Amino acid sequence: MNIIGSDRNTNIGGFMWKFKELIRDKTFRRWALSIILTIPTSVSTFISFLDLDARCRLIILLILVGLSLVIIIVQFIRLLFMNNITLNLNGSEVEIKKGDIFEVPRNNYKVIAFNEYFDTQVDDVIIARETLNGQYIKRYYSHQDITELDQKIKDDVKLKIEEKNVERPFGGKTTRYSLGSVFKDMDFFLVAFSKFDRENRAQLKLNEYASCMLNVWNEINTLHASKEVFIPLLGSGITRHVDSDVGVNELLHIMLWTFQISKVKFREPAKVTILLYKNDHKKINFYKLKEFEKNGL
């Protein structure tokens, strides 16, 4: 596999997508038009009181138009390469940036998505090794420790059980929990996030995704103890969205929208940081996210 070529194609694709999004964005176009009209018009009004001939006035006007275009181009480039943003949502600070959940310092809470059974069997059948929960288990648990973790999850009375003794042809645990249930493990929040279809593929409908995120925010709100919470862009990995073709930009919008309507409050020093994995930040229109501070989705 040509990984370098694949990454290059991803970079170009993300760049072109952002370019088109900015060109089509009505807010940006209105701002650009206001710059072109405001600066030359304001200065032209001022110089109209000066004793200048027509040629000088034309030169000044052209310089001002050129300056306006430079301002617009500089802002366009800045937005095009923007890869992080901090929002104030209902009084809570929410930062969105590229990052690795496993590089977050200890004593900050981190969210890891599991399936609705809280499976811990990393064998590329039940849990794939390259997934975040697969990496989490391999990093922090030996075989003996996993047994202890399984028992702690089983004994947690706060987890809402949906069904017991579920028959699963590919193996795994048999107790199914409510989507959005959160189990606190050290400084990690393990979330029951995805379902399995008959072919053992992680999947989620869009309405289930939104409902799950509402539960996640409310659960985290009772557990974070005024600490910063780092959460990956949930659903951007191997989870299939069976009733819609949504990308990472749409998933991020849903995460922010559910955060807003949940009315969860993270007061200083607590805040939420949404981490974008690998090249996901290239598929996000950060400029558009500012609208959440005004009116949400």
From Swiss-Prot:
InterPro entries listed in its UniProt record: ThsA_Macro
Effect of a null allele: When this gene is missing the Thoeris system does not confer phage resistance in B.subtilis.
Taxonomy of the source species: Bacteria, Bacillati, Bacillota, Bacilli, Bacillales
Species whose genome carries this gene: Bacillus amyloliquefaciens (strain Y2) (Bacillus amyloliquefaciens subsp. plantarum (strain B9601-Y2))
Activity regulation (UniProt): Activated by a signal molecule generated by ThsB.
Cystine crosslinks: none
Protein name in UniProt: Thoeris protein ThsA
Keywords assigned by UniProt, alphabetized: Antiviral defense, Cell membrane, Membrane, Transmembrane, Transmembrane helix
Membrane topology: Multi-pass membrane protein
Function: Probable membrane protein component of the Thoeris antiviral defense system, composed of ThsA and ThsB. Expression of ThsA and ThsB in B.subtilis (strain BEST7003) confers resistance to phages SBSphiC, SBSphiJ and SPO1. Activation by a signal generated by ThsB leads to phage resistance.
Gene that specifies this protein: thsA
Superkingdom of origin organism: Bacteria
Residue spans crossing the bilayer: 32-52, 57-77
GO biological process, one term: defense response to virus
Annotated compartments: Cell membrane
